[in-house]
Amino acid sequence: MKLWLPILLAVFVIAAVPVAEPPVWKAGAASAKITPEKAMWMAGYAGRTKPSEGVELDLFAKAFVLTDQAGGRFVLITMDLIGVPRNLRLAVAERVKKEHGIEPANLAINASHTHSGPELRTSKIHGTDDLALREKEAAEYTAQLENTLVRLVGEALQKSVPAHLDYSTARCGVSMHRRTPDGKGGWSNFPNPNGPVDQTVPVLKASSADGKDIAIIFGYSCHCTTLGHQKFSGDYAGYAQQEIEKAHPDAVAMFANGCSGDQNPYPRKTMELAQTHGKSLATSVQAALETHMQRIKGPIRAAYREIPLAYDKLPTREQLLEEQKSTNTWQVTHATRVLQRIADEGPLSTTYPYPVQVLRLGNDLTWVTLGGEVVVDYSLRLKQDIKDPIVWVSGYTNDVMAYIPSLRIWQEGGYEGGGAMIY
């Protein structure tokens, strides 16, 4: 009996060891620096009067490729930039399909919306002495960016290995509603602690079969506007990614901005605050990683539509000519630009091809991406209406053309409710 006792104990010990769950995905990620190599005009603030003056924090583009057991794929690209020009998305999607067989519906490109990155869209510039130079620099940068994004997708595919995918969530208090009644029937851009927010931090981690980190993808609904200086920087989102990659050196950290149209980080204005906000967000991500994360299964299902979103009212020629007499330089620029477009291309379109995309991972996670500067009402409403276990909502994806107000904000007016269109 004494001889059998060690054998029986060994059998029980072996039986008690859990069987490792085999990976059901393949995943890979890649990253590249996209900081301009020379001074450029910066995007985000209309009041800037000169080009950039150095680098505070490098800008990055990153790609994540997920493959299910049936060979279905999904690609997420994130960028430390103001937005996603429509033509860039179309060009990258076409090349990714041609080179890798991935359908455009299965590609999402999200911008962090940092206001400390290079100018990509020059269509709203008019009448400046250096217009031709600014257009040339923006076009050259965007062409180089296109090549980088396509290359990153290929690198992420090459690096793909069998992987697990896990999800959790946390909260972060950096954001605050930024629309405050001005006492005169309007709205000012000012912190409003009583306004709606979505301070959820969704986190998706891809790891290899042996537990090595591949990618840590996280989201948050907040403008990247802590900073207002003349140096390139990813703002708080860039610092958050930096902190996560320090703590997880094998991982590519990727930030997907949410519905941030009416959300700002507070307090603002200094590099130290951007770093503090970034560390706060990174701490929330780490908290999510330390929970009992939910294992995500496949398959991948994705859908993409460009809906004909109708404009409210198109300006008449008479209204535009009257606007050209304004003392507001931006109104004059807006009117002149629209008149020139009518002269070159004919009548204005009555609709805009607005991108809406849905990614579903099995029956576990539904990720909705929307174009433009979407206000937080959309995130809150979609999470309420969609009954799936996990709902993740991102704005600033596939095209960033304008603010997208909710009906409430449209009726209230103000900057996000139509006032920003001249910029």
Locate each region found by the language model.
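Bacterial Sec-dependent signal peptides at the C-terminal "C-region" and cleavage site
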Residues: 2, 7-23
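Conserved beta-alpha junction segments in alpha/beta enzyme cores
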Residues: 21-110, 114-252, 256-276, 289, ...
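Anionic-ligand-binding alpha/beta catalytic cores of soluble enzymes and soluble regulatory domains
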Residues: 281
